[in-house]
Amino acid sequence: MNYSEDTPVTTRAPNESLALMLGGGGARGAYQAGVLRAIARRYPTLRLPILTGISAGAVNTTFLAAQAAPLPEATEQLVRLWLSLTPDQVYNVHTLPLLGNVGRWGMRLVGGGHAGKEPTKGLLDTAPLRRFLERALPRDADGALPGIQHNIRTGRLDAVALSATSYTTGQSVTWVQGRDVTLWQRPQRRSELASITVEHVMASSALPMLFPAVRIGTEWYGDGGVRLTAPLSPALHLGATRILTIATRYSRSREEADRPLTDGYPPPAQVLSVLYNAIFLDLIDEDIMRLERMNRMLDDMPPSDREGVGRETGPPF
């Protein structure tokens, strides 16, 4: 498609303030794609002008933001993308490179962090994932994704935002591409204007320790779920009045929650599972509960007292 020939859209749909927020969870991104396809089939004219993503959700967010096709067709393409994905398209599955990385990690620990001539940036080599994303997301010569800018210019998309963790500064950073964007800053969180590229997606989805950090500008970045304590915040700052997010686990009953996950001393896999759930899943649930409490509090306030709340400083997230 020749994007330069498209005419900007001036009319706006009634659901213009609806945002889609997609969190992390690795292969759970495939579940997100399936749910989005079901939603698009049920509501084929649905517009999602604000798209935000973290980790695996950044892959889905960026793919949808770059599509010229209507939502039903775009989600079908997204599902096909996940169905075509195999482990060897995510990381190098050969044993020798993995053993070499593990050995170098061990030497760094024993040596007090000294990297030597060839520092290991991650246990897994994710060059295959970068190639997979470059094939899935058409790029300009400078790496920009023309589909995103086209959708912003024509009014189909207001903004897309991806979040990552800066290992250089310790901050959570949200990259935003959109129109009429007002940036925000909170303690240990900041936003930046950016032209979204595959590198931003790689940075947002770089699992700690497992995947190598990604350098953008002068900073090194890893998975966006590590430091982002308010995952709904980017959507709110970008003007969303409603947020659609997709849970990748069901709400357990009290009996199920109290049931032991393992007998005896917890194995490393169980410890890592709890850790990663805390990073990628728990914060979204907590942020939703916090937003619901704030909405109930505002509903209980007289309309005259609500006027101007958040107008000067933006959402308190």
Model-based region annotation:
Residues 1-54, 62-317:
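Patatin-like phospholipase
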